[in-house]
Structure formats: structure tokens, C-alpha cells
Regions:
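Short Lys/Arg-rich amphipathic alpha-helical segments
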Residues: 1-101
Length: 101
């Protein structure tokens, strides 16, 4: 898996298990959608997005299997990654060009 860092989970939101992600990733529309898999934390735990919405400057995500705030709390402070091969966009992203001559 060629992983790309996309942001950090900075907090929970509400009691239903929603997580608040801060990200400056350019192609958010390509990843923040239902059934897309994000990889969270040092162990890169795969979590499937159930729902997504914007709230202020945050990306609010609800994951499958995260049913309440107690399930969500362990993810607070963790980094979020994607598999580059799962990103379906035309052209290149900045991360593709790093290290090229």
C-alpha cells in the first residue's frame, strides 16, 4: 500500500461517534464519501466511511463500527491516511512529484 497522509482526527463531535478531522488535502471530494476506506493510527486500522459532512473548517466523518462517543474516543489524536491506489483522480497530486528529478 502506498499511503498518503491526509490529516488528523482532532476530536469527537456529539454522542453518536462522529469524528472531527482537520485536513488540507486537495482532493477531499474523492475520499470523503460513503464506503471509502481511511486508515487510522500507527497500525493503519482500516475504517469505512458511513457519512461525511463539512462543519466550519472540519471534515466530520462517521465510520462503520463506531457507534457512539465511547467507540470514537480512542481515535482522537490519530493521523489519517489513504491508499494512493484508491484515489481515482486524473493527473498527479503533489505527493506523486516529491522526490522526482
Amino acid at each position: 500500500m502506498k499511503e498518503l497522509y491526509i490529516g488528523d482526527i482532532v476530536n469527537t463531535h456529539g454522542i453518536k461517534g462522529e469524528l472531527r478531522i482537520i485536513s488540507d488535502f486537495k482532493y477531499k471530494d474523492a475520499i470523503f464519501k460513503p464506503n471509502f476506506i481511511l486508515y487510522v493510527g500507527k497500525n493503519r486500522e482500516p475504517l469505512t466511511i458511513v457519512s461525511y459532512r463539512k462543519h466550519k473548517n472540519y471534515d466530520m466523518v462517521l465510520f462503520s463500527g463506531v457507534n457512539d462517543i465511547n467507540d470514537a474516543l480512542p481515535y482522537k489524536g490519530e493521523s489519517v491516511y489513504i491508499n494512493r491506489d484508491d484515489l481515482n483522480i486524473e493527473g498527479y497530486i503533489n505527493e506523486d512529484l516529491i522526490g522526482l528529478d
